[in-house]
């Protein structure tokens, strides 16, 4: 069991210092991190950068564990929904070049112009088409619990059941369930048979936290083991179920991202 690092964990550094994907790979190499998750949102020009990044990963002995996209099917415009599908389709050859067989996907964002029922139909339609294409390439799409459309365990399970594809599973984000006022262990009871990818994240309840739940509770991101998520029990239950996929750190705390990442890796070592 090894902890992979999502590039999202340094998203503030990327924004503030103009980091490229290659800069992230260099950071991981210096930190001794041997597994990474890359995201399509961080490419400046994927066609140009990808071969260089693949070569850098190989030369530094770093393995990509997964790839992630930020598609949104909750659009009342058919062309926008097609663009969301294309975003996933375009990720398939990138994932193959990186040597990964898991792509994290989203459902979409609920807005005042879109009803839940309409959005659910569009999400199912889009993910079904995407999963069919991914399956032909030997890749599994993993739907993250994120936002209001696929935020709870029951919502994610409903989408997976309707798509009904062996190539669409769950990215179990340990922290995001708190933002829809659901205990992560409760969600795990619902999804444990569907989990093929884990985003390891911790949140703590704080009055001035930046992240608000649907009920108005404030949370802040912290290093693993410093928050309210029972990460040790999640790992125990997944191990008992035979889970052998990746655990991917998504650090979303304040302060130094590098230090938050280091503390998270130290904590993860106590779970081994």
Model-inferred region functions:
Residues 1-97, 118, 165, 169, ...:
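N-terminal pre-domain/capping segments
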Residues 26, 58-63, 75-170, 179, ...:
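Active-site acidic/histidine proton-transfer and metal-coordination neighborhood
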Residues 1-32, 124, 150-172, 176-272:
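Histidine-acidic metal/acid-base catalytic patches
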Residues 7, 61, 68-71, 104-109, ...:
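Short, small-residue-rich loop/turn micro-motifs
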Residues 37, 66-68, 104, 142, ...:
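Conserved beta-strand positions in the central sheet of alpha/beta enzyme cores
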Residues 10-12, 40-45, 70-75, 109-110, ...:
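Short histidine/acidic/glycine/proline-rich micro-motifs that form metal-
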Residues 72-76, 111-115, 216-219, 249:
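Short amphipathic alpha-helical segments at helix-loop
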